[in-house]
C-alpha cells in the first residue's frame, strides 16, 4: 500500500500582504510541498483585498520555475468561518449566502479548482434535516450563479450543532444538488476520528465512504492527527503522529490507492519554538510523510 505515490501533498499557507499568492508559493516550495490551501481573507472577517492584488501570474511563473507547473489549478481555497448556509434564520442565512457567493467568485478569479466549506450548524431549525435542506438549497442557488469551482463539503467532528459529521448527511445533501460536477467532499481525518470513525480500519472505512457517498466525490483530504479519543466530538487537531490516530494509521490511509491521488493538506498545530517563536511543522511533517518515517521530539507531547 505504501508503495503508492502521493502527488499533491501540501499545507495551509497564509495570504499575507504584499505578495499574497507569490509569497504563498514561495513558502510551498520551501516546505517541499506540491499543493496548498489558503483563505482569501481573514477567516473571521468580512474584509477582503481585491483578487487583482494577489499576484497570481507571478505565483504561477514561480511554480513553473520550480518544476511545479503541473500543479495547475489543483490547490484549495478554504471558506471563512462566518458562513452558515444551514441557519434557519433567513436574514442571517442570506448574509452568509452573499458572502459565500463572493468567496466562490474570488476562488475562481484566483485560479483554484476547489473551495472547502464547513457545512454549518443546525441553528434556528426544528431538526438537522431542515438544516441540511437549507444548505442544499443555498448550494444549488450559488452553483447556478457561478462557474467551474468545485465546492467540497468538509466532514465535521459532530461538535455542538454541527451538521455533516455523518457520511449519510453528506450524501443527503449531495443527492439534492442539481449539478453534481460542482459538489464534492473534503475528508478531515481529525474530524472523522472525533466523530467516531476508525482510521485504524483503513479499508473498511474507505469502503464505507464509497458505499455511502462515493469516492468519485472525494477531492480533498485534510490531514490531521487528533488530541482526542475516537468519538470525542471535540475537534482538536494534533501534529502527525503525536495524537490518538497515530502515524501508521494516517500513512496507511493517505497511501491507499484510492486516496493517494487526492489533494492532501496538512492543518496541524504550530509549535512554540524558544528561538523562532510560534512556527509550523509543515516542512518536517511533509518530510516524515515522504520518508514514511516518524520523527520523535518535534512536539512537546504534554502541551
From Swiss-Prot:
Keywords: DNA damage, DNA repair, Endonuclease, Hydrolase, Metal-binding, Nuclease, Zinc. Its cofactor is Zn(2+). PROSITE patterns: AP_NUCLEASE_F2_1, AP_NUCLEASE_F2_2, AP_NUCLEASE_F2_3, AP_NUCLEASE_F2_4. Zn(2+) 3 binds at residues 191, 235, 237. Signal peptide: none annotated. Its EC number is 3.1.21.2. CDD domains: AP2Ec (cd00019). GO terms for biological process: base-excision repair. It catalyses: Endonucleolytic cleavage to 5'-phosphooligonucleotide end-products. Zn(2+) 1 binds at residues 78, 118, 154. It holds the Pfam family AP_endonuc_2. It comes from the Bacteria. GO terms for molecular function: deoxyribonuclease IV (phage-T4-induced) activity; DNA binding; DNA-(apurinic or apyrimidinic site) endonuclease activity; phosphoric diester hydrolase activity; zinc ion binding. SMART domains: AP2Ec. Binds 3 Zn(2+) ions. Zn(2+) 2 binds at residues 154, 188, 222, 267. The keyword DNA damage applies. Belongs to the AP endonuclease 2 family. PANTHER family: APURINIC-APYRIMIDINIC ENDONUCLEASE (PTHR21445:SF0), ENDONUCLEASE IV ENDODEOXYRIBONUCLEASE IV (PTHR21445). Endonuclease IV plays a role in DNA repair. It cleaves phosphodiester bonds at apurinic or apyrimidinic (AP) sites, generating a 3'-hydroxyl group and a 5'-terminal sugar phosphate. This is Probable endonuclease 4. It comes from Mycoplasmoides gallisepticum (strain R(low / passage 15 / clone 2)) (Mycoplasma gallisepticum).
